[in-house]
Amino acid sequence: MNPLIFTTILMTVLLGTMIVMMSSHWLMIWIGFEMNLLAIIPILMKKYNPRTMEASTKYFLTQATASMLLMMAIIINLMHSGQWTITKVFNPTASIIMTSALAMKLGLTPFHFWVPEVTQGISLTSGLILLTWQKLAPMSILYQISPSINLNILLTMAVLSILVGGWGGLNQTQLRKIMAYSSIAHMGWMTAVLVYNPTLTMLNMLIYIMMTLTMFMLFIHSSSTTTLSLSHTWNKMPLTTTLILITLLSMGGLPPLSGFMPKWMIIQELTKNSSIILPTLMAIMALLNLYFYMRLTYSTSLTMFPSTNNMKMKWQFETKRITLLPPLIVMSSLLLPLTPMLSILD
């Protein structure tokens, strides 16, 4: 793709998301979503082959359906309230349809069906954009309409997303699918606390983006797309493999790593505002995610696959250094001591 065209398309993706996040008018929000959708398709299809074509088509159809539902909810809300502002969703039917549309855009259960298939069919770089930047716009709208959302529907979606995100990733060998199911589970954690403490949801989103960005950059750096190819990186780049292990454990939510902080604060917030059953269920279901993270770390760093090379370390050219990677790894693993400073979120 021509660099100028690619830059223009990328800037349109960024502009579409920024329009959604900064607008208070429903029509402008819908236009921002459409700009973002039409511009992201060529990025997903950058490496043109039948797999990327299929993945892009699935993504387009899903997001177009979600946009249609969103416009329907906007019109119903307009008929009942007579205003285009995003301050409140006045009609319960409009609220349910709007929540479903945004859940489809985010990949929440039961609208999660497209996330693993689309992520698997595209490149690692496109997958990174899909699982991080593309979550910002719908989550910002959910954040703004959180007082109007039906709590029971949102909590049901959240719990099912954590369950499906853990269960779906158990027998996967493809790293992109594992990251997709991980994304579904993390979205579940975010939406579970959205009504009670929206600011905590945004904190969780920030830490999730940092951890996912770190993981994808490490996968790109080691050229790994499957658990088998990842297990061979120990011979080539042991430091990168160690960093992958630490980041995976952080994504699983193990203390004293950064990923433990949002889970801890979300469970604390839910315990304050609702019964003890919901946070207990969420913590138990999070063990499914932790299991496949631990299995991945075991196959990556604690097993040595047979190799025809007798040398422990393989000879290789000097790999390209990524300047952004060290600070991202630090933030993805060492933010837990900052937790007392975040007491303001209460």
From Swiss-Prot:
EC number annotated for this UniProt entry: 7.1.1.2
One GO cellular component, as annotated: mitochondrial inner membrane
Alphabetized GO MF terms: NADH dehydrogenase (ubiquinone) activity
InterPro entries per record: Complex_I_Subunit_2, NADH_DH_su2_C, NADH_UbQ_OxRdtase_chain2, ND/Mrp_TM
Domain of life where this protein originates: Eukaryota
Subunit description: Core subunit of respiratory chain NADH dehydrogenase (Complex I) which is composed of 45 different subunits. Interacts with TMEM242.
Record's protein name: NADH-ubiquinone oxidoreductase chain 2
Source species of the chain: Equus caballus (Horse)
